[in-house]
Amino acid sequence: MTTLTAQQIACVYAWLAQLFSRELDDEQLTQIASAQMAEWFSLLKSEPPLTAAVNELENRIAALTVRDDARLELAADFCGLFLMTDKQAALPYASAYKQDEQEIKRLLVEAGMVTSGNFNEPADHLAIYLELLSHLHFSLGEGSVPARRIDSLRQKTLTALWEWLPEFAARCRQYDSFGFYAALSQLLLVLVECDHQNR
């Protein structure tokens, strides 16, 4: 990626972590349809690989603004996709895709991070990977830790995530009939792919 700064990428990862970690509340629902978010989406679209995914997400957000009982319906989508059995869902855990659930714990230790007691999910939840990537990108921008060390850890995290993210995103597309989380997962997939290629 060429036009986005490390801090901007960190913000995108943190935002996605938040959206994949819990159902949207009324305030978040208002925020994603705001003029401020439209500006943010314009910035993201300046990165050509992200353009189509951001356009699709904006289309889903526009549809959301006219959806009856939008918050409740989106909450039902969230529960159906991420909290039910894996038969017709896209569970947001590395272990659901036969990946080593201990890998993220090792990466967190290497980064000097621990999971928050406020987040009542296993450590291999997608949001934890995204928070770690956000932290690493912020650290790259600060310059307090050698960039080579941070970049090595970033690549390890991206590699571990990439082993199951494509299947997760495919399941989101398959089972999210409204398409908000499908669009969100597609944006994440493209972002991670670009980040991974940007060695």
UniProtKB/Swiss-Prot annotation:
One of its GO terms (biological process) is protein complex oligomerization. It holds the Pfam family Nitrate_red_del. InterPro entries: Chaperone_TorD (IPR023069), DMSO/NO3_reduct_chaperone (IPR020945), HscB_C_sf (IPR036386), TorD-like_sf (IPR036411), TorD/DmsD_chaperones (IPR050289). It is found in: Cytoplasm. SUPFAM superfamilies: TorD-like. Its main location: cytoplasm. It comes from the Bacteria. Keywords: Chaperone, Cytoplasm. One of its GO terms (cellular component) is cytoplasm. Belongs to the TorD/DmsD family. TorD subfamily. Involved in the biogenesis of TorA. Acts on TorA before the insertion of the molybdenum cofactor and, as a result, probably favors a conformation of the apoenzyme that is competent for acquiring the cofactor. This is Chaperone protein TorD. It comes from Escherichia coli (strain SMS-3-5 / SECEC). The lineage of its organism: Bacteria, Pseudomonadati, Pseudomonadota, Gammaproteobacteria, Enterobacterales.
